[in-house]
């Protein structure tokens, strides 16, 4: 993947999405389709954006019992997305089942990455709401190591943790870092963020 920039299509309709993508004259950015757009438009939005020549990260964060995730991943694999994800907290067994479901009969599959801790989560909320007392970066590293052990290609993590993840899992292990914001920009409900310039310097 290198250091691809993934553009979020955080819209509630196909019309808004295509109007946005039409602004990229002559370019076909790697795009993220999240829950809002996918639940509004269904698989057809994936097929149409793919038909337009874009690479797609389908960001649905699956988290369920292993067999349900396995069957769901088999469906997503047929959509020919380039990358999709799940929650690492679903256990190694769930992640292994996801790989099985995602792998096509010819042995190919989309890139599969695991969400470690959402960038809206901080130490306080992790301890009080999730009853996880370990330091957040330690939890992220543990989840990343589990994802690698289960055969996944990478993780979603804060840009603050990407360098440490590569130190543990190797430089080829994919890190997708959603918490990248301009210094004077609105960070919304994100807690663990970094500026684009700082993120660029992370290995």
Language-model features and meaning:
Residues 2, 68-153, 161, 168-172, ...:
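Conserved anion-binding
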Residues 6, 32, 57, 82-85, ...:
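Conserved beta-strand positions in the central sheet of alpha/beta enzyme cores
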Residues 8-12, 34-38, 63-65, 89, ...:
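Active-site beta-loop-alpha junctions enriched in small/polar residues
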Residues 12-23, 67-75, 136-146, 191-198:
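Short, acidic/polar
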Residues 21-26, 44-53, 74-78, 100-106, ...:
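Acidic (Asp/Glu)-rich catalytic clusters
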Residues 30-83:
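Metabolite-binding pocket within alpha/beta catalytic cores that recognizes anionic/polar moieties
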Residues 43, 157-198:
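A C-terminal functional module that forms or caps the active site or interfaces directly
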Residues 200-203:
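Conserved small/polar residues in nucleotide/adenosyl-binding loops
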């Amino acid at each position: 993947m290198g250091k691809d920039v993934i553009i979020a299509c955080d819209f509630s309709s196909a019309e808004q999405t295509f109007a946005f993508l039409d602004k990229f004259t002559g370019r076909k950015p790697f795009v993220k389709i999240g829950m809002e757009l996918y639940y509004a438009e269904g698989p057809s939005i994936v097929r149409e954006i793919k038909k337009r020549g874009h690479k797609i990260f389908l960001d649905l964060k699956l988290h369920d019992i292993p067999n349900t995730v396995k069957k769901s991943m088999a469906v997503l694999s047929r959509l020919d997305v380039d990358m999709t994800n799940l929650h690492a907290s679903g256990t190694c067994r769930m992640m292994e089942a996801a790989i099985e479901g995602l792998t096509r009969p010819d042995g190919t599959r989309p890139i599969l990455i695991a969400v470690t801790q959402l960038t809206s989560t901080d130490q306080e909320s992790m301890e009080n709401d999730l009853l996880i007392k370990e330091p957040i970066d330690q939890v992220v590293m543990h989840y990343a190591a589990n994802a690698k052990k289960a055969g996944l290609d990478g993780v979603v993590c804060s840009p603050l943790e990407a360098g440490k993840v590569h130190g543990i899992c190797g430089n080829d292990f994919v890190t997708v870092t959603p918490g990248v914001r301009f210094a004077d920009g609105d960070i919304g409900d994100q807690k663990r963020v970094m500026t684009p310039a700082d993120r660029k310097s992370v290995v």
